[in-house]
Amino acid sequence: MSQRGRPRAFDRDTALQAAMRVFWERGYEQASLSELTAAMGINRPSLYAAFGDKAQLFREATALYQRTMNFTTPALARPTARAGIEAMLRDNVDAYCDPATPRGCLVVSVAAACPDEDSEMKTMLTSKLRTVGESVRQRLKQGVEAGELPADTDIGALAAYFETVLQGLSIQARTGASRQRLHRVVDCAMRVWDSLSGEPQKRPARQRSA
């Protein structure tokens, strides 16, 4: 019996991984269907059958990204809030500059370039970023409760500060900043913590590659 006309068999997870990388490298608007199908090794009918459309494919790709590239949650679980915040920043710097993957954070990069008129996409991306911000806020709250920070610390403002630093690190990495430079930014950010806590942390100099 002829096989002509039957949909091409493919591994959905592998195809989704490839799509995630295209979106990560190119962004949402810039990633064409031709680029996506070529990277995924499928044709357009197969893409539509398996994922619906480009927007739904992107939603699945960002969900995969968050499952596989989530360095924030384990970092914030460190024994102290200060150690958790610092690990969150440094671990993400290392991920943003990993030569094996595109630079920066997929969600931050696409959110920054997302046109305001695409309200559904913008809402989805900002919701993901707010989730990270809320995790940071909760960890800072625990730090205040544990006496790491003064009781009158403006937790909301401090959380927004570290969230801004985290997103800025992604943008800087995306535009070519070195790992070494970004770790120095983290050094500065943690001095803000120390100025609030009144207890400067003394650590041995770290050897970091550029």
Residue ranges and their predicted role:
Residues 103, 108, 153-172, 185-192:
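Hydrophobic alpha-helical segments that form the core
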Residues 84, 99-123:
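Amphipathic alpha-helical segments used for helix-helix packing
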Residues 74, 79, 83, 119-145, ...:
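Amphipathic alpha-helical packing segments from all-alpha helical-bundle domains
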Residues 3, 14, 18-56, 60:
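Helix-turn-helix
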Residues 60, 73-104, 155-162, 204:
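Hydrophobic alpha-helical connector segments
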Residues 63-69:
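Short, basic, alpha-helical segments at the C-terminal edge of helix-turn-helix-like DNA-binding modules
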Residues 2-4, 87-95, 130-145, 165, ...:
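C-terminal peripheral helix-coil segments that are non-catalytic and often amphipathic
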